[in-house]
């Protein structure tokens, strides 16, 4: 029996952990060196609720320099992972400011999973000290949940690519969301060529 194919696109600020999340899930290895992504694709097989699914994983660049290139990733998307980092309250602020408007524009009826990356850094003393200097603190679970409600996300999950905690759950949840029937006049992402 042929696998069902679904397309997953990951968005979020630069350095918020998108690429590490994808690499840990698809290759089971944690990259120790940060190299900003321009555009990467991975494929991973996952079984959810007895269904074999081939997930096309589309990594995107979070930096503003790529704001005009990123929409090329959106056509035919089945689910969005919208990421922020627990050690960067600013990356959570950018969810409603930047990422939701962009995704809702190009993918109006695609389910969004809000993902808190780098969960392991929430209790890291060095991170807490650095954030305290700027009168900030790591993002709390309640803040993430509240944001998920605010943006009407399909679900909210937390994970750590470094410890692998929660990684599989993120992709299982995303796959379930991608498999659900969509409602609304527009199925999936609009073809960005029409809007550019």
UniProtKB/Swiss-Prot annotation:
The record, for Gene3D superfamilies, names:
P-loop containing nucleotide triphosphate hydrolases
Give the induction note. Answer: Up-regulated by DNA damaging agents like H(2)O(2) or ionizing radiation (IR).
| Residues annotated to bind GTP | 12-19, 59-63, 117-120
Q: How is it modified after translation?
A: Prenylation specifies the subcellular location of RHOB. The farnesylated form is localized to the plasma membrane while the geranylgeranylated form is localized to the endosome. (Microbial infection) Glycosylated at Tyr-34 by Photorhabdus asymbiotica toxin PAU_02230. Mono-O-GlcNAcylation by PAU_02230 inhibits downstream signaling by an impaired interaction with diverse regulator and effector proteins of Rho and leads to actin disassembly.
Give the membrane topology, semicolon-separated if more than one. Answer: Lipid-anchor
Q: Which residues form the propeptide?
A: 194-196
Residues carrying Phosphotyrosine: 154
InterPro entries to which the protein is assigned, alphabetical: P-loop_NTPase, Small_GTP-bd, Small_GTPase, Small_GTPase_Rho
Where is this protein chiefly located?
Answer: membrane
Lipidation, S-geranylgeranyl cysteine type: 193
Result, substituting residue 14 to V: No effect on internalization of EGF receptor but decreases trafficking of receptor to the lysosome with associated accumulation in late endosomes
Q: Residues where Cysteine methyl ester occurs?
A: 193
Which SUPFAM superfamilies does the entry link to?
Answer: P-loop containing nucleoside triphosphate hydrolases (SSF52540)
What else does UniProt say about it? RHOB is one of the targets of farnesyltransferase inhibitors which are currently under investigation as cancer therapeutics. These elevate the levels of geranylgeranylated RHOB and cause mislocalization, leading to apoptosis and antineoplastic effects.
Task: Describe its assembly.
Answer: Binds ROCK1 and ROCK2. Also binds PKN1/PRK1. Interacts with ARGGEF3. Interacts with RTKN. Interacts with AKAP13. Interacts with RIPOR1.
Q: Can you say what this protein is called?
A: Rho-related GTP-binding protein RhoB
Q: What species does this protein belong to? A: Homo sapiens (Human)
Q: Which gene encodes it?
A: RHOB
